Amino acid sequence: MAYQSEAALEQQFIEQLNKQEYTTVAIPDYDALVENFKVQFEAFNAPKLDTPITDKEWERIFNLMLGKSVFQSAKILRDKFVLEREDGTKVYLSFFDQDHTKNIFQVTHQTTVVGKYVNRYDVTILVNGLPLIQVELKRRGIDIREAVNQVMRYKKHSYNGLYHFIQLFIVSNGVDTKYFANSDRDLMYSLAFFWTDFNNVRITNLKDFSISFLARDHIIKMLTRYTILNDTDKILMVMRPYQVYAVEALIRQATLTNRNAYIWHTTGAGKTLTSFKTAQILAANPNIKKVIFLVDRKDLDSQTTEEFNKFEAGSVDVTDRTDVLARQMKDKNRQLIVTTMQKMANAVKRPQYEKVMDAYKDEKVVFIIDECHRSQFGDMHKDIVRHFRKAQFFGFTGTPRFEVNGKTEGKITQTTEMLFGECLHNYLIKDAIFDNNVLGFHIEYIKTMEGDFDWDDPTLADAIDIGELYMSDERMSLIANHIIQNHKAKTRNGQYTAIFAVSSIDALVKYYDIFKKIKHDLNISGIFSYGQNEDAEGKDEHSRDSLERIIKDYNEMYGTNFSTDTFSAYHKDISDRVKGKKTKSLDILIVVNMFLTGFDSKPLSVLYVDKDLKYHDLLQAYSRTNRVEKETKPFGIIICYRNLKKRTDDALTLFSKSQDTSGIVVPGYQYFVEKFNEMVMKLKEIALFPESVDTMQNEDDQKKFVVTFRELTKYLQSLQTFIEFSFDQDALIMSEQEYQDYKSKYLMLYSRQKTDREVVSVLNDVDFCIELMESDRINVAYIMNLIRNIHFDDPKQKDYDIKHIKDELGRTDNPQLLRKVEILQAFLDRVVVGLESADEIDAAYNDFENEAKREEIVAFAKTEDIDASMLTDIISEYEFSGTMDAGNIRDRIEKPLPLLKKRSLVNRIVDFIRQHTEKYQ
């Protein structure tokens, strides 16, 4: 049976949309798109318009709409605007309505748009004439990643004008279908999602997807409710299916019942966005007097503040003053309040707030509690419940409490169901890993003590002081050395960071001191909460003094000025370094309890464990490592220095509701060896020798080579995280040299494909996953560090150091560094040779690079006969916003040119700006 062609799939898709009451319209080119928009926009706004929109009025409308970024266009789309008519009257117009029955739905296909190149778009869905959803199709058997890459090409070359109003992209090959939000930035495949049913079962077939996702009432909800404008990052975010189902379930619960409920969404699944969106929607309901979003104080002080203000700018009040909360409660116009559990508990107990708080005693108030099992909440729950007699409480948790792991008070075990009632929706860790919304775990258990008995047997507690054994100098030194020796292999040469969880403050301080005695180049620090009235008997040092000492070392390491008096600022700085927000990161952070729950960091990939953990505490701690980042982070790595195997199995079984945890814990070393060897054999069937790639004339063969070598490298990436990995092993059937030779051919094809050409190539849309190929050790930061450490006081050694740096520059395959090689070599030859110390290296390099930037801009401007200052301004705007408008560039070119020549010049300017910015970023 022959494959269904892309054209046949397209026709079938359009016929399905016709059945769903989308009207097919012929739009052959961009001009036709504009004309259709005019007709549909007038029809949609007809009840508000007495007369047709005039040409001058259209000019005003297009001045509002065009030349804006994707993010700005999304804001315009959602706002009403005032059109001043030629007769002086004013009318409020809008682009679409939340009621799907009031909108006009159309579908068109094969629209040709001329940008840098001529592109033809597969299927466009229009709402009231605006292209809001773009669908790109591939024939069956083709990876839908290629459709994502095709969208990126179109964005770069021709998605301008009204196409900036595209909100969602859909990609499909008929059997696999995903959706993702538009962006001014490069699109990430990891942010393309499958749609599912309520039970998290994927709906991948294009026809079924159309019936469910593109139902007119549903797609309007996705556009109006479930696409979020992130004000901080200036990007669009579209919610995942399980988030949508949870919000819908809670809205039904709040509007149709008075019962409490909770949502079980695994750690890392985006509960904060789900809970905040629920609060936002319920706050618009006139039957609900207040919606109060409760968080723990420490959450509000850290990352949750940032998250909330992304979703709604200025939504969070970070003060600890209860009178501010009382003022917000009194304000009838303030429907949504974000506050802490502590402030709310104070407000209902203190007499001075009694009048304000009593006004809501018998009103419908909804409380939404993010991470509903924070320790403080249980203690304050009763006071709040007692006061608000008609309140509903909705909780969110990634690790619910059941009989087996709940908090026991007397003879009663407090469970999540007891506190919040029924679970309305669940999305478990196995679901999240399957959807690649979080990573699986690679867990290693390292034996650190010998003996003919079970160290985890509780009956031994009286006979043996296990705590003393765990704290022995020999054992702790063994563990510290093991961490130092293996850390770089585990973190891809320091590309990622780690947390080391230990059992007590005493253990933390002791480990910290042991690390200081070992020779290494890692940045290691610690953090803990100290007791104000601590019993210091039997201790050499009060824990606050220990922390002060650790902070002092931290200040020397990073040039900061913290102390225990500025603990919050120290906490924030450490948090930023573990998240990779600072130039100089932290390699290992030692903690007792802090950072083990609720802390999200994509660059955090390793957890070293020397403490007892079980159930929710265990999964929460492990889950710090499993945030999806990019291809170079295939899983979270857990290194256990205690026997937590059974406890790990128990926790994963409980929170996945299954005895089968195979998808959660990744297989062992031998599995990846076998997979690597399988891919080597497959690769050699395509290209027996590296040189065989040079003689490949057929692009389909080149594509097979690229895809196979890419997959081989992914298995190698996983292998390299295992302690036992070595290319010299007999178990591997490819040597390191042979791998590097094949890799050079892969990079050759990548380089050839990346060069912009009008020639259509099957490689254009292949995902090369180039970050997998980078030798991250030799990157810009590494080279600059080598330059800073040149021996300027020894001329002979200085010459050797400079030669070594040039050799390293010649060996790099890091794309960012490759763009800077010529600048760095020139800096070494012209500036560094004349320096006598490293004191001014950074300032000297910045001056040198800025001059190189200026010269490059002037040279290009001279070649193209354009104004250099104009070019500099456009580059500055692009560096700030990340967006470029070709129409704006065209308008700023003053010299008269024929249309085609001006278009060609604009394309060259756009290419120069992109390459220039990439080079100097």
Annotate each language-model stretch with its function:
Residues G467-V591:
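Conserved C-terminal RecA-like helicase domain
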Residues L336-I369, R374-D383, V591-N593:
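Conserved RecA-like ASCE ATPase "motif II neighborhood" in helicase/translocase motors
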Residues V591, L596-Q620, G636-C640:
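A short beta-strand element within the Helicase C-terminal
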Residues A2-K290, D299, Q303-G314, K332-Q335, ...:
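ATP-dependent helicase/translocase motor core
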Residues N405-T497, Y512-D521:
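Interdomain helical connector at the RecA1-RecA2 junction of SF1/SF2 helicase-like NTPases
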Residues T266-T267, E371-R374, H387-G406:
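Conserved helicase ATPase motor motifs in RecA-like P-loop NTPase domains
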Residues R624-L654:
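Conserved segment of the helicase C-terminal RecA-like domain
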Residues E15, I53-T54, R259, A284, ...:
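Catalytic cores and motor modules of nucleic-acid processing enzymes
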